[in-house]
């Protein structure tokens, strides 16, 4: 009887000195965490009465030039970003260079009432906000016709003169 399962693929993997209990640990954790935070950017979307709003909390140090917002295929909002990190250390007997590149993107199909020509994007403190306004309509929502409400008639009140007492 073997302790290794016949089809256990992890049993046949080559030994990796940076692997601890099945998870890979980067040799230089600061570079990996910075890159993975950028690549795993979450884009939140919500709808208001006037617009569709998309927000992304980007990692510290991301520049406006690294983020791109565009409308593709008529009604698809595309938010992309690319970041490259290069680290170089020169010693007396060594020269060490590390490079890392990460990208993120989000594609959102916009409804027919989105005005794609007026898309606005702003970035403040690492928070990217993209606003897509809606078409303004002057129509009021139709109120369903209901049965007429009967008029309430108050009973007649007799007018009595109030006599002044002496």
Curated annotation (Swiss-Prot):
Compartmental location: Cytoplasm
Domain sHSP: 34-152
Induction of expression: Not induced by heat shock.
GO BP terms: protein complex oligomerization; protein folding; response to hydrogen peroxide; response to salt stress
Pfam short name (any one): HSP20
UniProt key word Mitochondrion: no
Main location: cytoplasm
UniProt-listed PROSITE patterns: SHSP
Keyword terms: Cytoplasm, Stress response
Superkingdom assignment: Eukaryota
GO cellular component: cytoplasm
GO molecular function list: unfolded protein binding
Family: Belongs to the small heat shock protein (HSP20) family.
Self-association state and partner proteins as the record states: May form oligomeric structures.
Protein name: 17.9 kDa heat shock protein 2
Source organism phylogeny: Eukaryota, Viridiplantae, Streptophyta, Embryophyta, Tracheophyta
């Amino acid at each position: 009887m073997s302790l290794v399962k016949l089809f256990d693929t992890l049993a046949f993997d080559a030994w990796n000195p940076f692997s601890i209990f099945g998870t890979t640990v980067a040799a230089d954790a600061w570079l990996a965490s910075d890159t993975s935070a950028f690549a795993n950017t979450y884009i939140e979307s919500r709808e208001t009465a006037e617009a569709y709003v998309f927000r992304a909390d980007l990692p510290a140090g991301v520049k406006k030039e690294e983020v791109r917002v565009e409308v593709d295929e008529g009604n698809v909002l595309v938010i992309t970003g690319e970041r490259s990190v290069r680290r170089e250390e020169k010693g007396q007997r060594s020269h060490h260079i590390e490079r890392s590149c990460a990208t993120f993107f989000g594609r959102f199909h916009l409804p027919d009432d989105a005005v794609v020509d007026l898309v606005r994007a702003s970035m403040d403190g690492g928070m990217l906000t993209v606003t897509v306004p809606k078409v303004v309509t002057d129509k009021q929502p139709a109120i369903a016709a209901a049965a007429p409400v009967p008029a309430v008639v108050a009973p007649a009140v007799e007018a009595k003169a109030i006599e002044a007492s002496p």
